[in-house]
């Protein structure tokens, strides 16, 4: 079928891991707090302040409910990057005189890896756990990495590039048994997969508003109260957020995050069914029409809104240019500006050639069946054309192992 026939509104948004569109119900909930309900939630002497404070506390309880936390355990931040920094650096600063070791994973989000590298310069020892070819960590390797000096294990819930879901419950059990704090960057999983901080023994969890159809510039950090977890603040000031994060709270953004969490709580099952159906339709139709396409990351232990594919014999950059009617990404949005192959794919043992051909397709709440079908038609027709032009594809067809070729450097 010619993709130009039956085309939906173009371009089609398929980059839901980078950000999500604002749910109209979220926008509606936020608007009054930009206009008539403009009070400072920390003003205690008049109704404008009380009104804002009530709205903030309601949002806090909505965020808490989605992960089975207590309302008082939610600290509002500017987003998951700040939450990750506060969790990792905050623990290191508070407990660093007693212990000096942190464990994380090679495939974590860049802000976690960079926070850890920063701490290495301050004398903290960091262990970067490898991942298996399916993108998931090995629990025995984690057990063996923990020492009596380990203060924190930081493992994300859902990987932003390949969508795999790490075994949080098992990791939490290991950490609790060994007396080590467990932090998880749950930005890509919050509101999309069931996460219960008590069942999973999570001590700190980082949340982002704009990954769950909420506004940008707002996030949260869950900090366990029992047994109590202490973090040294990164920002000093008026002592807001139980002293962990000073600064006037942005009421409209917090109301938006709360509403997004409330919606996710009620429609998570429906969203999951929708995304799983579109994942199967997208993947099966592509596999039926073109060969040598590989799904990166475990097929079952993943959030299926993330479809990271490698197309053998074609450069990822040329695919993105060819399918410009689809808004997609080659890796995480923070690093897709660099032409280096993804460090996440490389850490799974995927060769440089195949890593360079990978594209991340993101589907979500507002993706339609028509958009998925259009995307499949467009991708298949363009990949066929690009492969006809590709000397690499010719070599693959002739059975030449690209890994064994010695490339000339200019």
Curated annotation (Swiss-Prot):
Gene Ontology BP, a term: [2Fe-2S] cluster assembly
Catalytic reactions on record: (sulfur carrier)-H + L-cysteine = (sulfur carrier)-SH + L-alanine
GO MF terms, alphabetically ordered: 2 iron, 2 sulfur cluster binding; cysteine desulfurase activity; metal ion binding; pyridoxal phosphate binding
Keyword Metal-binding (UniProt): yes
Required co-factors: pyridoxal 5'-phosphate
Compartment list: Cytoplasm
The keyword Iron-sulfur belongs to this UniProt entry's keyword annotation: yes
Positions bound to pyridoxal 5'-phosphate: 80-81, 160, 188, 208-210, 248
Broad class of where this protein is predominantly found: cytoplasm
Modified residues (N6-(pyridoxal phosphate)lysine): 211
Pfam family, one: Aminotran_5
Assigned EC number: 2.8.1.7
Annotated catalytic residues: 334 (cysteine persulfide intermediate)
Enzyme class, spelled out: transferase
Binding site for [2Fe-2S] cluster: 334
Known role: Master enzyme that delivers sulfur to a number of partners involved in Fe-S cluster assembly, tRNA modification or cofactor biosynthesis. Catalyzes the removal of elemental sulfur atoms from cysteine to produce alanine. Functions as a sulfur delivery protein for Fe-S cluster synthesis onto IscU, an Fe-S scaffold assembly protein, as well as other S acceptor proteins.
Family note: Belongs to the class-V pyridoxal-phosphate-dependent aminotransferase family. NifS/IscS subfamily.
Subunit structure: Homodimer. Forms a heterotetramer with IscU, interacts with other sulfur acceptors.
Protein name: Cysteine desulfurase IscS
Gene symbol of the encoding locus: iscS
